Amino acid sequence: MIRIDELLRAYRKGLFPMADPDDEKVYWCQPYKRAVVPLLSYMPSRDVARILRRGEFEVRIDSDFEGVIRGCAAPRKSDSQTWISPEIMDAYLTLNQLGVAHSVECWHHGELSGGLYGLSMGAAFFGESMFFRRSYASQVAFDHLVRRLKDRGYLLLDAQIMNPHLQKLGAVEIDHDEYMLQLDIALGKKIRFI
């Protein structure tokens, strides 16, 4: 079982947990290169902007956190394995109950169509995972997250490990020392996600 105080302390030190997909053993990650999303320069793609204008999705915050984390942990077409073990899921469900972990959800005709979840600490948001069941749902959730963070004065959106999808969303890689500097500044501020 992951102790909540240890988990929060780890994030403050630039670490985050992942589970081995084969045996579900939890280990701590601290990549040398960190993916972050520069909040001030973020712009949605033309396709996402079009979807936003059409208002296809109802966006909610924390109305079904468990549904989002389960959606993120579910096997994907491209990869049947997940790093979100039951132990990690339980820890984040507790963090949600404590008001530290949050979900941004896209609903379409009353069904959860996609979303993302992460942790809010100070002026930093640590994006953990996203999923979709309907095209563009996770990207719309991401757009709403970025706008919420900008509106509230957040300084850091940590996307953890770069991948092609994050790169399309505007993430860039920074080295560990720069990340820790940005993290330290962000943790020194008090901002409420909700």
Curated annotation (Swiss-Prot):
GO terms for cellular component: cytoplasm. InterPro entries: Acyl_CoA_acyltransferase, Leu/Phe-tRNA_Trfase, Leu/Phe-tRNA_Trfase_C, Leu/Phe-tRNA_Trfase_N. Its EC number is 2.3.2.6. The keyword Lipoprotein does not apply. Gene3D superfamilies: Leucyl/phenylalanyl-tRNA-protein transferase, C-terminal domain, Leucyl/phenylalanyl-tRNA-protein transferase, N-terminal domain. It catalyses: N-terminal L-lysyl-[protein] + L-leucyl-tRNA(Leu) = N-terminal L-leucyl-L-lysyl-[protein] + tRNA(Leu) + H(+); N-terminal L-arginyl-[protein] + L-leucyl-tRNA(Leu) = N-terminal L-leucyl-L-arginyl-[protein] + tRNA(Leu) + H(+); L-phenylalanyl-tRNA(Phe) + an N-terminal L-alpha-aminoacyl-[protein] = an N-terminal L-phenylalanyl-L-alpha-aminoacyl-[protein] + tRNA(Phe). It comes from the Bacteria. One of its GO terms (biological process) is protein catabolic process. One of its GO terms (molecular function) is leucyl-tRNA--protein transferase activity. SUPFAM superfamilies: Acyl-CoA N-acyltransferases (Nat). It is found in: Cytoplasm. Belongs to the L/F-transferase family. This is Leucyl/phenylalanyl-tRNA--protein transferase. It comes from Chlorobium phaeobacteroides (strain DSM 266 / SMG 266 / 2430).
